[in-house]
Design a protein with these regions (language model features):
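Polyanion-binding surfaces on beta-sheet-dominated domains and ring/shell assemblies
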Residues: 1-194
């Protein structure tokens, strides 16, 4: 079976990352993974969740959303539903956990880094693109905080990135586009550190 876009089974789509895409965020990156485009930005807040108050440790959390016309047919915004949908909630938890796994939260100090991942265009792999782009934006935000003298060093223990693996018509493939993902009998995400 030939892949839809002619790639080898173990080949990623072309990746382009534009760091510093937004002017006002402490860190940001636009990641383009083939036709999937995700804007990731980080905001530093001088507060932590109540369970961390007085601990000296920081927190990293994420929000994930898809613009209504990021897809072929319009999807409704979570705000019109009055709640975060189950899929988006699962994805934002995965992004947050992936980033916390590589961060030294004690060295971050009592502050929260809020990572926003907004899908501008979706062609499969939005959550994996969001994780990879969010890491770049997070690194840039930490670099900004270090340059401002807020933190003494960049509190990251490792890099993190993600991709998908799936089986489509009996063939194992890496980095599925939407059409492949829709046909996959099995698919899963791989999140790895450096």
């Amino acid at each position: 079976m030939k892949r839809i876009d002619g790639r080898a089974y173990d080949e990623l789509r072309p990746i382009k990352i534009i760091p510093g895409y937004q002017s006002f965020a402490e860190g940001s990156a636009l990641i383009k993974l083939g036709k999937t485009h995700v804007l990731c930005s980080v905001t530093a807040e001088e507060r932590v969740p109540s369970f961390l108050k007085g601990s000296g440790a920081g927190w990293i959390t994420a929000e994930y959303a898809m613009l209504p016309r990021a897809t072929v047919t319009r999807t409704r915004r979570d705000s019109t539903l009055g709640r975060v949908g189950g899929r988006n909630q699962e994805i934002q938890r995965l992004i947050g956990r992936s980033l916390r796994a590589v961060a030294d939260l004690d060295a971050l100090g009592e502050r929260t880094l809020m990572v926003d991942c907004d899908v501008l265009q979706a062609d499969g792999g939005t959550r994996t693109a969001a994780i990879s782009g969010a890491y770049i934006a997070l690194y840039m935000a930490m670099e900004t905080l270090q340059n401002m003298g807020v933190i003494s060093s960049i509190p990251l223990k490792s890099a993190v990135a993600a991709t998908s693996i799936g089986i489509v018509n009996g063939s194992m493939m890496m980095d599925l586009c939407y059409d492949e993902d829709a046909q996959a009998g099995v698919d899963f995400n791989v999140v790895m550190t450096s």
